[in-house]
């Protein structure tokens, strides 16, 4: 009877242990959803609760806890908070021990460590060293991981920050060539990457370089897409800032042609009517603007 009671108690303990671990996993899942909505404070709270449960259940050195710490560090980094480095490094060390150096999860944590020095600490030389190591490890993995583009471009970001534009340009052109070969020269995947690279240069103060990548992306996106309209606006504005009159005129004509085509489409939804009212107001046609506002 005593043996039976001890066995029952052991089973109950194991069940409670399992439930606690499962609760931690659920908290991490909830936190990821919150992170996707950019609700970082609530996500951080849930991740810290999950971390406490992992430690409580003996999962101090586990893949699950490493994932929790990785996401926790990322949430702090998205808020540009220094705590992000501590959690990211803990995740990286844990993943390196459990999974090995050439595991993509370890490399992702190493990448985030580099991002801390690049975007928060602004220690560009150190960021370049870490992102160089990230890329070196990533390049060993075959077949090429889907994260490879991002890891390599992050190294280019370091070179741009350091003013080493030739090195950055070499990486960018290499990645574009790879993407064109993988997805096709006129694929939307390539267009999105070109747009991303354009933003990278633009935000780094190199508008003259960024706009050339925006133009390449613009020439791929369909003219009825939101990206096309967005890039048309961005490119026009940049050439105005750069005082490049021939390009300003070129994109003004493209904008006029695009607007004319859009006006030929049916429009009876409030959002569409409001947008058209704003357009007519911008060109000084107040009668049509008023009519569309009233109809909306």
Could you say what each language-model-derived stretch is?
Residues 56-60, 97-101, 140-143, 181-185, ...:
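Short coil/turn linkers that connect adjacent helices within long alpha-helical scaffolds
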Residues 1-23:
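Bacterial Sec-dependent N-terminal signal peptides
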Residues 199-202, 218-296:
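Eukaryotic tandem repeat interaction scaffolds
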Residues 40, 81-82, 124, 165, ...:
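TPR-repeat structural position
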Residues 25-36, 63-78, 88, 104-119, ...:
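Conserved alpha-helical positions within TPR/SEL1-like repeat arrays
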Residues 16-48, 52, 56, 60-70:
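N-terminal leader/linker segments that initiate helical-solenoid repeat arrays
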């Amino acid at each position: 009877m005593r043996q039976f009671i001890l066995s029952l108690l052991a089973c109950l303990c194991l069940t409670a242990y399992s439930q606690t671990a499962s609760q931690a996993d659920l908290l991490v899942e909830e936190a990821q959803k919150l992170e996707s909505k950019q609700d970082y404070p609530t996500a951080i709270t849930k991740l810290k609760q999950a971390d406490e449960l992992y430690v409580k259940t003996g999962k101090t050195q586990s893949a699950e806890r490493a994932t929790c710490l990785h996401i926790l560090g990322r949430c702090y980094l998205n808020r540009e908070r220094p705590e992000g480095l501590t959690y990211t490094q803990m995740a990286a060390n844990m993943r390196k021990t459990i999974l090995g150096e050439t595991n993509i999860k370890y490399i992702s944590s190493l990448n985030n460590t580099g991002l801390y020095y690049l975007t928060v600490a602004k220690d560009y030389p150190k960021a370049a060293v870490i992102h160089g190591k990230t890329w070196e490890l990533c390049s060993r993995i075959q077949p090429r991981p889907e994260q490879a583009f991002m890891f390599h471009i992050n190294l280019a970001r370091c070179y741009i920050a350091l003013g080493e534009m030739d090195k950055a340009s070499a990486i960018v052109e290499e990645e574009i060539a790879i993407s064109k070969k993988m997805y096709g020269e006129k694929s939307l995947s390539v267009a999105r990457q070109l747009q991303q690279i354009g933003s990278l240069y633009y935000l780094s103060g190199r508008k003259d370089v960024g706009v050339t990548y925006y133009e390449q992306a613009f020439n791929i996106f369909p003219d009825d897409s939101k990206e096309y309209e967005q890039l048309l606006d961005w490119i026009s504005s940049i050439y105005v800032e750069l005082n490049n009159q021939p390009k300003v005129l070129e994109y003004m004509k493209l904008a006029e042609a695009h607007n004319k085509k859009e006006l030929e489409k049916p429009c009876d939804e409030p959002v569409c009517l409001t947008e058209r009212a704003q357009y007519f107001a911008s060109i000084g046609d107040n009668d049509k603007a008023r009519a569309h506002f009233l109809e909306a």
